[in-house]
């Protein structure tokens, strides 16, 4: 009986692996992919044109400036993946945990923390009819509550592949070091993140500041930016557990070289790109929530430049190498404030 159960488990694992292998083979580039994709025929939203069909129509229209921008981003991503990605392990369902599903509108959204993901979760909840369709009425706590939005990892391999074929998949990215600076400021340098600081800040202080005061070792409330970077670069960090999602690389969260993304939005052009996605979803009347106060790209860049100013060129280079794939895949140049060796 024991051997028979073991064989069944091995067979089930093999079937799951084979199904996910199909998932990994999904084409990255939009235009070649249309010939092999259902274009909404298996979409769960009904007879109206799916967001993927609308994007296909725009892709054929030379007058659509935004469609051209997103086509270029897809092509650049596809080219960078071909040049720089290595053979990787098979994707497991848990790898799809960051891909959220909106069956009613035919959307797959891979969220990257510190790239407007709270507001995108608000929007998806509003699209589902919660808070009477007003994303601004949804608190950040509600938006991040577990189970409020289904993840692609919650479905069977067959259901995963069906959605990958028929739905519009999108993600939003940000200049990697500006995202890192934002994560440090909001999670380790602000007083309202006490629980996060006790978990990660205390660990950083205990490892990197041997003579720290007991209060700092317990609370982790005064982590310096240089200590945070040293923690990221320490090989022990990733041996102990995966990076926290707030500083994990975007490509490691969303696997853009193995999953096909139709729209690559950018934090730097957030308003335009968000409106483009909402238009494809048939929700142009829904306003994407803006930040509580005006923050331009210059403010984000200035914060990163100020924090990196006192970091040595040696550590700047090591950190750039750690996040290099995000720079390459999403077409970001090395920041001008870096002094790379």
From Swiss-Prot:
It catalyses: chondroitin beta-D-glucuronate + n 3'-phosphoadenylyl sulfate = chondroitin 4'-sulfate + n adenosine 3',5'-bisphosphate + n H(+). The modification Phosphoserine is found at residue 139. One of its GO terms (molecular function) is dermatan 4-sulfotransferase activity. It is a single-pass type II membrane protein. A motif (Cell attachment site) lies at residues 132-134. GO terms for cellular component: Golgi membrane; membrane. Keywords: Carbohydrate metabolism, Glycoprotein, Golgi apparatus, Membrane, Phosphoprotein, Signal-anchor, Transferase, Transmembrane, Transmembrane helix. Its EC number is 2.8.2.5. Catalyzes the transfer of sulfate to position 4 of the N-acetylgalactosamine (GalNAc) residue of chondroitin. Chondroitin sulfate constitutes the predominant proteoglycan present in cartilage and is distributed on the surfaces of many cells and extracellular matrices. No activity toward dermatan. This is Carbohydrate sulfotransferase 13. It comes from Homo sapiens.
